Each structure stands twice: as C-alpha cells, then as structure tokens.
C-alpha cells in the first residue's frame, strides 16, 4: 500500500464567484456554482446546466500550488468534454475551463465554508 499523499491547499469545495463567459449570478438561485478537488486526484464542478467530473493532476504555476485537469460531463442533455487548470492566488482560486471544440471561461472561486 502506498503512502497517503499530503493534503493539497486546493483540496476541498470552492464556490465559483465569477466567470468571464457566463453570469454566475443567474445560476446561484438553482445551485451555487462550485468546483471540488478530492484527495484521490478526482473532482467535479457545476455551473448552470454544466456538470463535469475531473481527472486532476497537482502541479505548480509561477511557484504556486495548482491543478491541471481533463473533464467529461454534460451540458443539459449534451455530452461534453474539456480540460482546465486552476492555481491558488492568495485565498482564492483562479483558473480556466475549456470545452473541446467550444467555449472557454476564466473563473474565480472562494473556499466553501464548513
């Protein structure tokens, strides 16, 4: 059995508070947009009708903790795929989510309470 990895400062649930391509405020009434990173290099995110499950790899960007990921999921009834990254900037995450052959958006997220 391998050693347990140390907890990443990015691990856990984060509330997406802004996106460059979509208005987060319009989706908060349905569900608080989030991105969540798990210890097992997995995770998920949801904003509006988009839900994705991630395969994550910890890394660094400019000397700061970061995660790069590929993802697959759905946008309403359509299957979608993509990639993305995020890095820890102070007490927030900043990153990008890309849809293969489609849209992209920057995002900012704050750690969820509790």
Q: PLM ranges: what are they?
A:
Residues 2-9, 13-19, 25, 34, ...:
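Beta-sheet ligand-binding and adhesion/scaffold domains
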Residues 24-64:
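N-terminal glycine/threonine-rich, aromatic-flanked beta-hairpin/loop signature
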């Amino acid at each position: 059995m391998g050693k347990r990895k140390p907890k990443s400062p990015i691990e856990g649930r984060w509330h997406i508070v802004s996106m460059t391509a979509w208005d987060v405020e319009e989706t908060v009434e349905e569900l608080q947009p989030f991105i969540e990173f798990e210890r097992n290099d997995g995770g998920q995110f949801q904003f509006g009708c988009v839900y994705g499950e991630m395969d994550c790899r910890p890394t660094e960007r400019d000397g700061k903790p970061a995660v790069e990921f590929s993802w697959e999921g759905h946008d309403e009834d359509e299957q979608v795929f993509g990639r993305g990254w995020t890095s820890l900037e102070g007490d927030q995450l900043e990153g990008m989510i890309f849809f293969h052959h489609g849209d992209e958006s920057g995002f900012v997220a704050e750690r969820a309470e509790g």
